Amino acid sequence: MSRRNRAPRRDVPPDPKYGSRLVTMLIHKLMMRGKASLAARILYDALEIVRERTGQDPLPVLENAVRNATPLVEVKARRVGGATYQVPVEVRAERGTSLALRWLVTFSRTRPGRTMSAKLANEIIDAANETGNAIRRREEVHRMAEANKAFAHYRY
């Protein structure tokens, strides 16, 4: 690890189509091997599918999905005197959003279906409706934190 100062957090520019920073972050999470335009096309197609299926503007649906999938607490391993404890810690807003987007993309990739756009659209709709794998993962993380509440005094 570098001993220099921490790198400053870069500002995420809003995407050109929706003017949303969240959409740009999701494009970056989707991107593989630097193919940003392909990732953008997949996401825009997915958002169009969301518009068709829900009959609503896709941006609020996406924001709702990310809000629902964002964890409030998580566990971090902390070593104390030879034993490793899973210590529950609160999740900062940026990390929570990042985790939610990561889970949406990861579970979209593992879904059965033909195109990535359709799979991502389904995961976004499910997350907006409080169902789906991303929501299940958030619940799992919350359960782990709840189960290890006794070690909260080892907080970082």
Swiss-Prot record:
Gene3D superfamilies: Ribosomal protein S7 domain. Keywords: Ribonucleoprotein, Ribosomal protein, RNA-binding, rRNA-binding, tRNA-binding. The keyword tRNA-binding applies. One of its GO terms (biological process) is translation. One of its GO terms (molecular function) is structural constituent of ribosome. The keyword Protein biosynthesis does not apply. Belongs to the universal ribosomal protein uS7 family. One of the primary rRNA binding proteins, it binds directly to 16S rRNA where it nucleates assembly of the head domain of the 30S subunit. Is located at the subunit interface close to the decoding center, probably blocks exit of the E-site tRNA. This is Small ribosomal subunit protein uS7. It comes from Synechococcus sp. (strain JA-3-3Ab) (Cyanobacteria bacterium Yellowstone A-Prime). The gene is rpsG.
